[in-house]
Amino acid sequence: MKPLHLKLNNFGPFLKEEIDFSKIDNNELFLISGKTGSGKTMIFDAMTYALFGKASTEQREENDLRSHFADGKQPMSVTFEFQLNHRIYKVHRQGPYIKEGNTTKTNAKFDVFEMVDGKYEIRESKVISGTQFIIELLGVNADQFRQLFILPQGEFKRFLISNSREKQGILRTLFDSEKFEAIREILKEEVKKEKAQIENRYQQIDLLWQEIESFDDDNIKGLLEVATQQIDKLIENIPLLQARSKEILASVNESKETAIKEFEIIEKKTLENNILKDNINQLNKNKIDFVQLNEQQPEIEGIEAKLKLLQDITNLLNYIENREKIETKIANSKKDISKTNNKILNLDCDKRNIDKEKKMLEENGDLIESKISFIDKTRVLFNDINKYQQSYLNIERLRTEGEQLGDELNDLIKGLETVEDSIGNNQSDYEKIIELNNTITNINNEINIIKENEKAKAELDKLLGSKQELENQINEETSILKNLEIKLDRYDKTKLDLNDKESFISEIKSAVNIGDQCPICGNEIQDLGHHIDFDSIAKRQNEIKEIEANIHAIKSNIAVHNSEIKFVNEKISNINIKTQSDFSLEVLNKRLLENENALNNQRDLNKFIEQMKEEKDNLTLQIHNKQLRLNKNESELKLCRDLITEFETLSKYNNITNFEVDYKKYVQDVNQHQELSKEIEDKLMQLSQRKLIEQNNLNHYENQLETYNNDLELNEQSIEMEMSRLNLTDDNDIDEIIAWRGEQEELEQKRDTYKKRYHEFEMEIARLESLTKDKELLDSDKLKDEYELKKGKMNTLIDEYSAVHYQCQNNINKTQSIVSHINYLNQELKDQQEIFQLAEIVSGKNNKNLTLENFVLIYYLDQIIAQANLRLATMSDNRYQLIRREAVSHGLSGLEIDVFDLHSNKSRHISSLSGGETFQSSLALALGLSEIVQQQSGGISLTSIFIDEGFGTLDQETLETALDTLLNLKSTGRMVGIISHVSELKNRIPLVLEVKSDQYQSSTRFKRN
């Protein structure tokens, strides 16, 4: 990620400020300088806040970023443009605030844009989703951004001096190693669940085994005494247990079947005796009821005589009733005939009146026919009357337009001829322009090659001079080194080792006496005097140390010079002097000017010709359009004339209005005549139809009357014949019989009921006599006692069998469940063994006591340290190397860092370093961390880094080394920005971003020293 432009509004001390990072050429190193509190670190805060909504340091909250001098109605916002993977993005973040005069907070806003074809297009417009978009785009979150892009004040050396637990948190964030801890937790939970399931399965097996029914059987009890943990023994005993249970069930079933058969015998015997007893009682009762029924026989015979007489008189009564109905019909027919005759007379009168109206209408027939003829002939004109009326209105306008269009067309033709004369034989020559452009490009390339070669030669001479100077220094230092090594070899180092043993020799002398045996060599001690000059030895040792220190310093200088020569050689190898033209710059510039003038002249000529051609095409198009309009005008004018002629010929009118008035009047008269004529015809037809209907009705009524009279005569004859057959003389006899008809239904029901009961008694008595014949009735009480005894015994055995059967089936189900649990348990133990082992390994139960996450973090830390040591060796003059401490720290292994001093060949705690040495180590470690994260993250583009930390703790030489390290970062294509108050940096770094403060707000500007 490379910053391009930063705009701040009401952010920290910046009320309205813009910083253009595009002024930084070729990713050069630049310094951010200013007084304390001017807002230098706020620039880093602004970039971090724009991307992630957080400051560059964790201690600063979002509310602390808003300027105290900001307008209460204006929001705090940051707009940040940056380049990533050759694509340009812009983010605009507005912080939440309570607007002056409001009580509710205005929410935060965040927009993400991407430049496409020179314009910004929005990608996200919500705070949460936009921030997530930036995290996915950059490949880092805010914490990782602080470690990789911005090394903030106070946090620069945090990673170096932190303990293992703190480093674990930092590395976990940078390398996303929480997934390995999550794997450990998942495996731990999985093992916990599996162990719980296994224990639960053992408990289920034990519970099922304890619930198996023994039936108080010694064999089963013996089988159940096996412990449930002995699952193999359980598998052996289960078939034996099931077999013994089946034997017990079979024995109980046999007793049950015997009891059921005995009960069925006594049950059948009891049922048959009860049925016989009921049949005898029923037979006696039916015989008594049958005798009582026979006593009603005389009454039933009288009822049957009355019913027979009622049946015989039925026909006579029907004839009498029919006579009354026929007489009523005859009277109604006579009334209908009279009404119909009156209706026919009224219809004849109405027809005579309508005939008079029809005759008067026919007298106007000739006049109507002439109007119909006119309407038919001119109907087509009236239907399109607007067309003809418009023709009268348009004809004069079209004549005027035609004349005007003709004049305009002639003017355009004359203009076209003038343009064609101007063009003449001239033609556009674009090939010549291409040829001139190519020539100019080639000349520019030759000029650039000459300039680049001159610049490269100057740079080469400078580098060769630097290389020669470095080689001379190396030769001089090599000569001095050889002299020092020769001087060092002259010392006898074997005689200098006693200096370290001075206290040891003194202790031995104090513990022995003359004449004792020496504890070192075993000889007799002759003298305890001083035989060793320790002062002389110490002096020579100091001289040797001084020589060795000088040798080491010279070797370091030689190594540095060799490194510088290597760097110079790389620059020399990168210098490329190209083949250049034989012409001088003056000649090439003159040729360039001539070709550029020729190119401009040809472009002007082409432009003039194209303008003339464009004007010609425009005039041609106008002529064509005018001709089309003129043709259209003539066509419309001819059409108007034809329509007017057609109208006047057919209508004999020369005025549209008069024609319309007469036509509508004729149509109205014809319609009125036709409607009235149709109305009269409809009335005549209706009268004719109504008269025909009434005539048919009259004939129908007369025929009905004749039929009714004939029916009445026949009915009278039938009445006389029936009275003669029944020996009835007058109507009084008939009335008496008719009085019985009200009781007929009751009499018939009484007779039918008697006959039905009589028949039922006969059938039932015969049936019961057949069922009780030759059968003996037993003692019911004895049978009942025996029945209850057998039933109780049977029920007891059925219940016992049901219980035993249920318990046997339950035992089978439980043993099957036990077998299933055992099989599943064995398979589960087999399958989960590897998971148990894996869980122990990743949880730290291994030979190194390392969890999986710590193992991964140690791998990354080793890579970071290796990368950091490449720079630390240069910055510390090959004295210090960072190493990882192997000892356990606070329960975490190997995440703390020590420093190894090559001068003393010993490792020591990082806190023993001076302020400058700590800065060197922190810078090397931070840069190593940055590079390793970039390698591992796959896609993070680290094209810039900003450092806000103490260069003031460094001496002059160390400061130079640190600057060289940062300059090397520039050569890798990374922009490097530094915040510092060190005045030496202002002299060494040519580009400075100066931050000035006027007490309440700050401003920035780039300047060069």
UniProtKB/Swiss-Prot annotation:
GO cellular component terms attached to this protein's record: DNA repair complex
An example Gene Ontology molecular-function term: ATP binding
Coiled-coil region(s): 176-364, 392-502, 535-802
Record-linked InterPro entries: P-loop_NTPase, Rad50/SbcC_AAA, SbcCD_Nuclease_C
CDD domains, per the entry: ABC_sbcCD
GO biological process: DNA recombination; DNA repair; DNA replication; double-strand break repair; SOS response
Binding, ATP: G34, K35, T36, G37, S38, G39, K40, T41
Expression triggers: Induced by ciprofloxacin and up-regulated by LexA.
Listed Pfam families: AAA_23, SbcC_Walker_B
Annotated keywords: ATP-binding, Coiled coil, DNA damage, DNA recombination, DNA repair, DNA replication, Endonuclease, Exonuclease, Hydrolase, Nuclease, Nucleotide-binding, SOS response
Similarity remark: Belongs to the SMC family. SbcC subfamily.
Function, as annotated: SbcCD cleaves DNA hairpin structures. These structures can inhibit DNA replication and are intermediates in certain DNA recombination reactions. The complex acts as a 3'->5' double strand exonuclease that can open hairpins. It also has a 5' single-strand endonuclease activity. Is probably part of the SOS regulon and involved in DNA recombination and repair.
Subunit-structure text: Heterodimer of SbcC and SbcD.
Protein name (database record): Nuclease SbcCD subunit C
Gene: sbcC
